[in-house]
Amino acid sequence: MAGPDQHYEPAIDKRDFDDHRPLLHDIDTGIDGTGDGRLRSDSRLSAFRNLDGGSDGLLNDVVDEIVERDRRKMAMEVMRVCSFAVGVISCLGAGSITAFSLYGPLFLTRLHYSQLQVNAVSIAAEISMYLPVPLFGYLCDRYTPSPLALLSGLVFGGGYLLAAFAYRSGPLPEAGGEGWPPWVMVVAFVAIGTATSCMYLAAVTTCAKNFGRGKHKGIMLAVPIAGFGLSGMWQSQVATYLLCERREDGSRGDVDVFRYFLFLALFLFCLGVIGTFGLRIVDEEEDQYIDEAVEELERSGLLEESEFFRPRSEVQAAYGTFSDAADGDAPGPELSLTLSEEEREAARLEKEREEEERRKKNWLLNFETRLFLQDQTMWWLAVGFFLVTGPGEAYINNLGTIIQTLTPELHPPNAPSPAGLPSTHVTIIALTSTIARLLTGSLSDFFAPPATHLFPANIESGRRSSQSGPTAKRPTLSRLAFLLPSALLLSLGYLLLSSPLPLQHPGLSHVTTALIGLGYGSAFSLVPIIISVVWGVENFGTNWGIVAMVPAAGAAMWGVIYSRGYQDATDGGNGSPDGQCHGWRCYGFWAVGCTLSVWVAVVAWILAWRGWRRRGVVV
C-alpha cells in the first residue's frame, strides 16, 4: 500500500478504456483531484512533442542528404556522358592525318617532290604523332586532359596554316618554280602529328578513366578509337566533293589542297577549344582507382608498408597517446581558439590531406610505370604492335602512289584509274577499320572472361555473385582470340597485294584495302583494351603512350623501305615522265616483307598470351 505522502500510480488495464474517454484523463485530473498529474502529463506531452519534432528534423536531414547524394551522382553521370560525347567528337576530327594519301600524290606532280621527300613528310608526321605519346599520357594521368586539348587546337591551327601556304608557294626552284623548300612542309606536318597525338590521347584517356571499370569498357574505348579512323573518311569526302578544283567543263578535279588545309586549320582549332572545356574526368572514379590500386599492390606483396602512405596526422599522433584535456577538466589552449583560427586550422589540414593524396597518386603511378616497363609480356605485346602497325601506316600513307602503280602506263591521264580513286580507298580503309574496332570492342566485352587480377577479392566476389545464371554459363573467349585472327586477315591483304593478281585485275586492290583496314583497326582497338585489362586504367595514359610509340618506328622503317623500292624501280625503267612508277617492282618486295612482318607479330603475341596465362592474368 502506498503511504499518504506518495502518489498513487494506478495500474492500467485494457478494460479501463472506452471509446469516448481521453487516454490521459485520469492522469490529468489526478487520483485525488489535484493538478499534479496534469503537470506531469504536460511535461510528458512536451517531451513527446520535442521527440516528434526531433524525429521530423532527423528524417528531413536524411531525406535532404539522399536527395543531395542523388543530385551529385546524377551530375557526375551527366559529366561522364558529356565527356564521352566530346571525346568521340574530338577523335572524329583528330585523325586528319589518315587522309594523307589523298593529297600525297599531288606533292609529286604539283610541287615536284621526289618520292623520298614525300615519304619524309609523312614519316615526320608519323614520328611526331607517336613519339610524344608517353609524355602526353603522363600529363593526362597526373593532371587533366583539358590542357592537352587546348594545345592540340593551337598546334593544329598553326600546322595546317603553314602547310597551306607552303603548298600555295608552288613547285620547287629546281623544277622552275619559287616554292618553299620541302623542310617547311616537314615542319608543318611535325606540328600536325604532334597535335594529332595530343587530341587523340586526351579523348581516349578521358573515356578510359571514366568507363574503365564498367562491364562495357571495351566498347566505350572502341567508339572513340573508331571515330579516329572515321575522321579520314568524312574529311576525304568533304575534300573530294566540296573542296575540289573544277575543270573547264565543270567536272570535279583534284582536291584543292590549299582550301582543304585552311578548312582543317579552322575546324580543328575550334575542336581543341571545345575539348578544353568538355573533356573532364570524374574525380570520384579516379580516386577510387588509385585507392584500389594501392590495396591490390599491398595484397600482392609488391608494396610493403611504408611511412609514405601514413598520413602525417598518424605520425604525429604516435608521439603521444593522451591529450592534455584528458588530464583534467581545465580547458587547454586548443579550446580557446577563435573561430577564425579553427577555420585556418581546418584549411591547413585539408591542404595537407590534398598534398598527401597528390603525393600518393604520383608515387603510385611512377611505381606502376616501373612495373609496366619491367614486365616481359609488355615487350612482346609492343613488338607485335610494332610489326603490325608499321606496314599498316606505310600502306595508308602511300595508298595514292600504290594505286598509280597498278594503273597501266598507257591509261588515259584524265580517266579514272581502274584501281579506284584515292578518296575511295581512304573511305574503304576508314569504314573497315571502324567496323573492326566496334566489333572487336563489343564482342570482346561480351565474350571475354571477367578480370580477377586487378580487383580486390571482395569486389570481384560480389560481382560474380551478382551475375545471372545465363551469363555465368555463357562461353568465354580471350581478347587474343580476336586479335590473332585479325592479324592473319591483315597478312592476307598484303599477300594478295604481293601476288600478280592486282596487276591483272586492278579492282582487287579494293579487297586488299578492306583486309588491311580490318586488321589494322582491330589492332588499334584491342591493344589499348588489353593494356587497360592487364595493367589497369589508373596509369593507362602512360602505359598506352609507351606502347603507342612503336608505330612511329614501324612507319618510318616500312615507309623508307617502300620509298627506296619505289625510287629504285622508277630509276630502273619502270617510271613515267611525270615521275610515277608502274608495275610490280614498285611495291612487290615491300608487300612480301609486310606479310612476313605480320606473321612474326602473331608469334610475339602468342608468347605474351602464354606469359599472362602462366601468371593467371585473364585477358
From Swiss-Prot:
| Cellular location(s) | Vacuole membrane
Keyword check for Ubl conjugation, yes or no. no
State a single Pfam family of this protein.
Answer: MFS_1
Membrane association type: Multi-pass membrane protein
Keyword entries, A-Z: Membrane, Transmembrane, Transmembrane helix, Transport, Vacuole
**InterPro entries documented for this protein:** MFS, MFS_trans_sf
User: What GO molecular function terms would the record report?
Assistant: transmembrane transporter activity
Q: Where does this chain mainly localize? A: membrane
* Regions crossing the membrane: 88-108, 120-140, 147-167, 184-204, 219-239, 261-281, 377-397, 428-448, 480-500, 515-535, 541-561, 589-609
Q: Name one GO cellular component term.
A: fungal-type vacuole membrane
**Protein function:** Probable transporter.
Query: Which PANTHER family does the record associate with it?
Result: TRANSPORTER MCH1-RELATED (PTHR21576:SF45), UNCHARACTERIZED NODULIN-LIKE PROTEIN (PTHR21576)
Belongs to which family? Belongs to the major facilitator superfamily.
Q: Please identify the protein, giving its name as recorded.
A: Probable transporter mch1
Species of origin reads Aspergillus fumigatus (strain ATCC MYA-4609 / CBS 101355 / FGSC A1100 / Af293)
